[in-house]
Amino acid sequence: MQDQRELGGAAGQGLPLCAFLSDLPEQGGGVSLRQVSKDSGAPGRQSGDAVEWARLRCALPPPDGEARTSGGSCEGLSTSTARGPDPGEHSGAWGEFEVFQESSASSEQFCQSFELQERPAASQPWRTASAQKQHGSSQPHQGGVTGTGAIAASELVVSCEDVFRSAFQEVPVPQATEGISTLDHFLEARNEESSGLESAQKLCSESRKLWRALHNTGTMTISRCTWSESRSRENFLPVLGVDAAQKSLSGSPGRTLGEPGLHEPEELGFHLQRCRALIQTKLSGTPTGGQGSLITYSLFLKTPIHGNGQYITTPRKKKTFGPRNLKLTLFNSDIY
C-alpha cells in the first residue's frame, strides 16, 4: 500500500516516472496500467502518462516467472495503443499508415499475379526443365510447354513436307533407252538396210550421201549428179549462205545452179555466164570428227566480162566451222 501511495502521489504531482523506476527493480513488472490511470489526477495527461508508463514498463527487464505474461501484455498494449490512439492527438496519421500498408500489400500481390499472367512462357520452361530433371527421362513432355512446342514444331515440319509433296508430285519417268539413234548413226551408217529405221533412212539418205562426199575431200567425189540430185543442192547452198537464185544484169530471171547454162565445176565451184551470182569456190578441211579439225569455205562474187568469156572474182565471205557444226547444219536444214 505504501508503494501504491507513493506511486499515486508521484503521478498526481506530475513528477517524472523515471525517478520511481530505479526504486522498483523487482516490482516494476508487476505494476499495472490500471493503477496508474486511477491515481493520476489530471484528465488531460491521463492517456499520455499511461502510454509512456506502459512503454517504460515494457522496457524494464521482467522477472523470470512473469516473462511470458509481461511480454504478452506489452505486445497487446502496444497493438492496442497503436490501433486506438488518443482522441486529442492527430487521429489520421496511424490510420493513413495502416491504409498505406494494406494498399501496398495488395498492390504487390496484384503485380505478382500480373507478372505471372504476362510472362507464362518465360517461367514455365524453367519449371518444366526442373520437373524433367526430377521425374527423369521417362516423362519428357508431360505437363510442360517445351514438349508441346516441340510437338507443334514437328507437326509444322510434317505439314510443310505434305504441302510440298502435294504441290510437286513425284511422277515416275520410264527410261527410254531403246530406239534412240544419234546423228552420227544417220549420217555415217554404211548399211542403210541394217539400221531398222526405214522412214528416217528415206529422209536422210541424200544428206548421208552428201555428208560422205564431203567427208572424202581428198578425191573428186562431189560429182554433178550428186550435187544436183533432188533438193540437196538447193537446201545446202542457202545453209552455207549462197544465194542460188540471183537475177541477171539484163533483168531476165536468174537461173539456179544446175540448169543447162551451168558449166562444169571449177575448183569445187560453179560459175554462170552472163549473170551475177554468189558461188562456192573452195571447201577445204578434213572433217574426220577429231578435235582441232576445221572446215573452211569461201564465197566469191564472180561477174562475167562481156565478149571476152572471162570473169571478175571478188571475195565476199569466208566462214570456218567444225565438222560437228556441219553435221547439225545438214541435219536441221531438212536436206534430203
Swiss-Prot record:
Provide a GO biological process annotation: intracellular transport
Q: Which stretches of sequence are listed as region Disordered?
A: 29-93, 116-147
Question: Which residue ranges run through the membrane?
Answer: none
Q: What segments bear the compositional bias annotation Polar residues? A: 70-82, 125-141
GO terms, molecular function: clathrin binding
What InterPro entries does the database record attribute to this sequence?
A: Aftin-like (IPR046359), Clathrin-bd (IPR029205)
Gene Ontology annotations for the cellular component aspect, listed alphabetically:
AP-1 adaptor complex; trans-Golgi network membrane
Protein name (record): Uncharacterized protein CLBA1
Q: Which organism is it from?
A: Bos taurus (Bovine)
Q: What is the lineage of its organism?
A: Eukaryota, Metazoa, Chordata, Craniata, Vertebrata
